[in-house]
A protein has these predicted regions:
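Hydrophobic, well-ordered secondary-structure elements that form the walls
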Residues: 85, 126, 196, 235, ...
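C-terminal segments that line or cap access tunnels to active or ligand-binding sites in enzymes
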Residues: 129-252
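A glycine-rich dinucleotide-binding beta-alpha-beta segment and adjacent secondary-structure elements
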Residues: 1-4, 169-175, 237-304
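Beta-rich nucleic-acid/ligand-interaction surfaces
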Residues: 47, 52-66, 70, 251-264
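Mid-domain catalytic core of redox enzymes
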Residues: 25, 55-187
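Active-site-proximal substrate-binding core of FAD-dependent oxidoreductases
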Residues: 59, 63, 323-344
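Active-site/ligand-binding neighborhood in enzyme catalytic cores
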Residues: 1-44, 51, 259-277
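A conserved FAD-binding loop/helix module that cradles the flavin
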Residues: 300-322
Length: 344
């Protein structure tokens, strides 16, 4: 999520190595991850609550985390537990969910000083009338750049006014989820989807942050439409057959991310994973264990951005909570699975 001059070589190497081995996609779409995870949680005695946003982390008289307060309708419900794990991100966890006295702890302030917000994201979701074959879509991720000096084009873009930026977007990530899913055509014959992502500054949309979702006014919608139109003109060059086959299109700004996934400034990869974040001191400081007893961090902010980065954060956090090396468990599981497969 950063320009090359601010990117860690080691992190980039991990990413390249990941894709050199081939990518993967869950059959049935991303929702299958939650669908198959929830029963495991419930089987272990846990539960999963929807429409129950956490309002604050509860501390006991000794300053230890002992539960969370969640919103239910117009009221609040306190849920108590011996261990509290937060995947809300460093800024949300420390600045929004913890009481002031815990937030003021030197260790927490030290972590906050080392963290910076990642850049906001702008996403376009497209529904298409036509199959993958009819529209020439591919199970491929495309990165489209407006030039070969990525630092220069991105810095100029992020320094420009919102009106200028909306017409001159230098970087796009284009993916076709429906083409990647081998079950898609059976479930949704003759239909396809695209998702396009780029970066956008939170400040470009900040004046509408207090407006109600879907009621932010004509100026906001016009700015959003300009971004969408510019993005789609580039996508039409990649997939020309889709231009007159669009049935649905929706743009999401940093405010959209702020509303639906509670990212403080519309960021999609959590905190900024730049070189400073990956220095030894920062890695040693931002750990799963927090200065508040019984409170742990997990997810992107603990490790790296993206799904696999968040998954690594979960393994690190789980190891800390259980006081057990889960990476060793995974290695043993892999070895056992390979041995079983070889006998088939």
């Amino acid at each position: 999520g950063v320009v090359p001059s601010k990117a860690s070589f080691s992190m980039h190497s991990i990413l390249v190595n990941h894709f050199l081995r081939g990518a993967w996609y869950p059959k049935g779409g991303a929702g299958e991850i939650a669908f198959h995870t929830i029963p495991v949680i419930r089987k272990a005695g846990g539960n999963v609550l929807g429409n129950a946003p956490v309002q604050r982390i509860l501390l006991d008289s000794q300053g230890k985390a002992c539960g969370v307060s969640v919103k239910k309708g117009q009221g609040l419900v306190n849920i108590f537990a011996p261990v509290i794990i937060s995947d809300a991100g460093i800024f949300n966890t420390y600045e929004r969910l913890l009481p002031a006295e815990a937030r003021a702890l030197p260790e927490i302030q030290s972590q906050l000083r080392m963290a910076t917000h990642g850049e906001g994201g702008f996403t376009v979701f497209v529904g298409l009338n036509g199959s993958r074959e009819e529209l020439g879509l591919e199970p491929t991720n495309y990165f489209i750049y407006a030039g070969d000096d990525l630092d220069e084009i991105m810095n100029r873009y992020l320094a420009s006014s919102r009106e200028e930026a909306a017409k001159n977007i230098p970087l796009l990530f284009v993916t076709c989820p429906s083409a990647k899913d081998p079950t898609w055509e059976t479930r949704h014959p003759g239909k396809s989807t695209l998702a396009i992502v780029t970066f956008a500054k939170y400040e470009w949309f900040e004046e509408w942050k207090d407006k109600q979702v879907s009621k932010r006014g004509d100026d906001y919608e016009e700015l959003k439409k300009t971004f969408v139109d510019t993005i789609m003109q580039a996508v039409f060059k990649l997939y020309p057959r889709i231009e007159d086959r669009i049935e649905y299109i929706s743009g999401g700004t940093p405010l959209t991310n702020q509303h639906y996934i509670a990212s403080p400034r519309g960021e999609i990869y959590g905190i900024d994973h730049n070189i400073a974040r990956l220095q030894a001191e920062a890695i040693a400081t931002v750990r799963a264990q927090t200065a508040v007893p019984n409170l742990y961090l997990t997810g992107q902010d603990l490790c790296l951005g993206g799904f696999v980065g968040a998954l690594q954060g979960a393994l690190i956090c789980g190891s800390a909570v259980l006081k057990r090396n889960l990476y060793a468990d995974v290695a043993r599981l892999k070895k056992r699975t390979q041995a079983t497969d070889s006998k088939k």
